[in-house]
Amino acid sequence: MIAVFRYLFELKEDDGICRQAQNSGTFYLFHNLSPFLKKVGSKYLAPQISVAEMKSMLGKFRQNEQMIEDSVLIGCSDECMAYFALDLGSLEKSVIESELRGLFTELRKAFFQLDGKDAPLLSSAQALLRWHDTHQYCSKTGQPTQKNLAGSKRVCHTNGIIYYPQMSPVVITLVSDGSRCLLARQASFPKGMYSALAGFCDVGETLEETVRREVAEEVGLEVESLWYSASQHWPFPNSSLMIACHAIVQPQQTKISVNKLELEAAGWFSLEEIMEALGREPKPLKQEDGSFSLWLPPKWAIAHQLIQEWVKLQASSPA
């Protein structure tokens, strides 16, 4: 892995080396921030397009091959083959889809159809592409900024200011009372889907303070103890670093008061209910009474990982 990290560093710092990598790397395609997917059996995959395929397709659109330099670096293989992402929003979407035999799919929808390998790359890709689209001018001079070839920064050549892509810290917390876990949903969620509580860190807050505030704000509960679990990049609404935590509330103080400005609903769920939900596919399932069965975020999402950790903790706890 050291060789991979060193190689990626070189690509970000040296446009000449990065240009060579573009001529031998592969590309993930987007159209107005929607990734290109192909259905293979029952799964959806994000195909890697070779530079030869890219040049051939651009030729059919009578586009200059230099358009490839609009791509952004998003990673590389263990063998140091670079991965890039390129948004072709200026070209006719249906023609590209027909040419490459796939579909551009809105990323939120795509997340429920992808495996764990493609999702992080597409997440990083969309976040970077969006950042470049919204930071084309210097906030101080109003003059155009220029990206380096890898897309790891933009420079205002009028005053030398360098802009780097940023992420907003967000805490995502799975609350438990010892025997149940608390899940919630926003009105924008797909029908029946519940997840852990989440919210942005305020300026000046510690991680612990954010967890306590968010739990109090959203469901009216006081956190007794908490601990860090893991982190994950998340491209919505712009680019966030999801900091996953577990939190415990006192079993005697579990009455939920839902903040309707933040959530549509929240509730306590038993281990049995969670186990059933983990066995369902991540998609809406309407029941005979018109309601929707509980289902959870996809396996690679950090909310799902938090829930899986809680299940393991319950299994290892004494009865």
Regions found by a protein language model. Give the residues of each.
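Cys/His-rich short segments
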Residues: 123-174
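Nudix hydrolase/Nudix homology domain
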Residues: 1-135, 146, 190-194, 236-238, ...
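Surface-exposed, charge/polar-rich loops and edge strands
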Residues: 205-206
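Hydrophobic alpha-helical positions that pack around
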Residues: 197, 211, 215
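Catalytic cores of peptidoglycan-degrading enzymes
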Residues: 187, 201-202
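Active-site-adjacent beta-strand/loop module that shapes the phosphate/pyrophosphate-binding cleft
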Residues: 232-257
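N-terminal strand-loop-strand
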Residues: 154-196, 222, 227-228, 247-249
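Active-site lining segments that contact anionic ligands and/or coordinate catalytic metals
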Residues: 223-231, 240-244, 263-264
